[in-house]
Regions:
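Inward-facing hydrophobic residues that define packing positions of alpha-helical scaffold repeats
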Residues: 56, 121-124, 202, 209, ...
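Bacterial Sec-dependent N-terminal signal peptides
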Residues: 1-37
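Hydrophobic-face positions in mid-chain alpha helices that act as interaction patches
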Residues: 54, 84-86, 93-96, 206, ...
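Aromatic-residue-lined binding/catalytic grooves and analogous aromatic/hydrophobic interfacial grooves
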Residues: 29, 210, 227, 232-260
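Short coil/linker segments at helix-helix boundaries
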Residues: 161-199, 203
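Membrane-proximal, proline-rich intrinsically disordered regions
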Residues: 28-78, 134, 306, 315-319
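Conserved, well-structured interaction surfaces
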Residues: 93-162, 196, 214-219
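Alpha-helix C-terminal capping/termination sites
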Residues: 64, 157, 161-164, 239
Length: 319
């Protein structure tokens, strides 16, 4: 299985590269609006292999941000679930609106999640358009594979949260989300982009993942590798109810990735390092302030707000 969970890694230091001209249609009321000292201009960043690699690391960091896999995507999935599964005790009105299925256009959580995802997509587009500066053939393939994996991952979440539902066996011409495959650097003009169909978005996601699989190595430290991309592709096919492809690709991962499930389920969580069943895990630290899973699920001694989200007894009794 593909696991997107946070890691409380005590000594992990990851680089968040902010490129001043790559902010896309979003600002965050919960963050200070400052120019980071580490920021560099786009032309400098894309002029060397090291710069391209740093943009890629920044794309990972943004994907693991609290707006996305650092907590909010998981929180939305819970809050949008059947009310019989959980309670929302929190005081954040915007999250309460999501739980009530009454989301208005200026919901800052929704805005920031969408904006953060497109920031990652824009960064991956920058990388893919400037791969020529990477001269080492193996590095070039790997970087292309990782960029397309991250782009596919973010589009898959965007279309599921912001597009209409995929309907198996139909044309799926219902509206999905805008597909943007070229770098945006000028944010002063009209940035509106028409929405693509759900079918078009899924087609792009599958294309990116197949190309990612072809380029990624089978092992790649804690970054995405070929089996990460295969596992995500299996999940995409499962969402499409293409069970044959989902099964075949999942079996490939199970049989060949070298990964295995933990003997004790609870040992898969609250670990200080990646574990045997992690095909891909976001490297999110509790110290970085980006771990919204801790904020809204954990008790106060663990750094949370006391449990804004809790499960119902009826749901717990199912286990």
């Amino acid at each position: 299985m593909l696991i997107f969970k946070t890691k409380q890694m005590k000594n992990l230091k990851y680089l968040i590269l902010t490129i001043s001209s790559l902010f896309l249609l979003t600002s965050c009321d919960r963050d200070l609006d400052i120019n980071p000292e580490q920021g560099i201009d786009t032309e400098t960043a894309i002029s060397t292999p090291e710069g391209i690699q740093q943009i890629l690391i920044g794309a990972y960091a943004n994907t693991g941000d609290g707006d996305l896999f650092g907590g909010d995507l998981q929180i939305y999935a819970d809050l949008l679930a059947d009310d019989s599964y959980l309670y929302w005790w929190g005081t954040y009105a915007e999250l309460g609106n999501i739980h009530e299925k009454n989301i208005i256009s200026d919901n800052v959580y929704v805005r920031d999640t969408r904006g953060r995802a497109y920031k990652v997509i824009n960064a991956t587009n920058v990388i893919l358009e400037n791969l020529s500066v990477v001269k080492d053939a193996d590095d070039k393939k790997r970087i292309e594979g990782e960029a397309k994996f991250l782009r596919a991952l973010n589009y898959f979440e965007l279309v599921r949260f912001f597009g209409k539902q995929y309907e198996a066996g139909k044309n799926n011409t219902q509206l999905g989300v805008p597909i943007v495959l070229k770098t945006v650097t000028d944010f002063n003009g009209d940035l509106s982009v028409a929405r693509n169909t759900v079918e078009e978005v899924y087609t792009q996601v599958i294309k990116d993942l197949n190309e990612s699989i072809a380029n990624l190595p089978e092992e790649n430290s804690f970054y995405a590798d070929a089996y990460s991309a295969k596992a995500l592709l299996s999940r995409v096919y499962l969402q499409k109810q293409d069970y044959t492809n989902a099964r075949n690709i999942a079996n490939d991962v199970i049989e060949n990735s070298g990964k295995s499930l933990m003997t004790n389920y609870k040992d898969a969580f609250n670990t200080s390092e990646n574990i045997s069943e992690d095909l891909f895990a976001m490297q999110v630290t509790s110290q970085s302030g980006e771990n919204d899973l801790i904020t809204f699920y954990a008790d106060e001694p663990q750094g949370g707000r006391g449990g804004d989200i809790s499960l119902t007894e009826d749901y717990l009794n199912l286990f």
